[in-house]
Amino acid sequence: CDICKNTMMDESPVKEGKIELAAAADGLFKVDGARLRLVNSFGQMMIATRHGNTPVKKGDKLCGTRIIPLVIEKEKMQRVRELCGDEPLLQLLPYKIKKAAVLATGSEVFRGRIKDTFTPVLEEKLAEFNVEVVYKQVLDDKPEQITAAIKTAIEEKGAEMVLCTGGMSVDPDDRTPLAIKNTGARIVSYGAPVLPGAMFLLSYYGEKQVPVLGLPGCVMYAKRTIFDLGLPRVL
């Protein structure tokens, strides 16, 4: 177990020859797949884990490990420890972001022709990770308004992440990517090989590298999208 865990994991007592690790807090679970395969190919011992890059809750089981025979040579265990090095095979990274802003864009929503149903969806998803929405606005499709609102959210309202909804396609009226770019944010990716959610944008703003995300409309109505894959990793 020593080669597996970091400080965010609790170790179970030995039961039926097996030891399990559980999450000591909510966070993102990560697995070093190459070194895990090394251990499991060594013979006479095994480690089974849940998938890496997945969000977990406090108390969730992360892995189980045991030796296959009744006994094993101490030298073999030591050899595996030396091959794996000092870094644990598994990491549980606590979420750092606690405050977010939601900026809903679109002329029809701004003028009240249709109801903003995007913001409630995001508030519910953020609540699953104990992230508070400290600032929310409904904005017209004008890049200068969206740019100003992003800066206000971060510099005045204390948002540690900004979510911009709508206006993410290549239509002339969809100006959210331009608005994000005009803040001076560093664009990491515009477009993702994921469906639903191909028109996703990820950027980071300012010295503190505050995440600013552009979310396509599918996030509003699809149960699982690129946002659900990316959010735990951004947090």
What are these regions (language model features)?
Residues 2-134:
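Short, glycine/charged-enriched hinge/interface segments at domain edges or termini
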Residues 107, 134-235:
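Short glycine/threonine-rich loop/turn motifs
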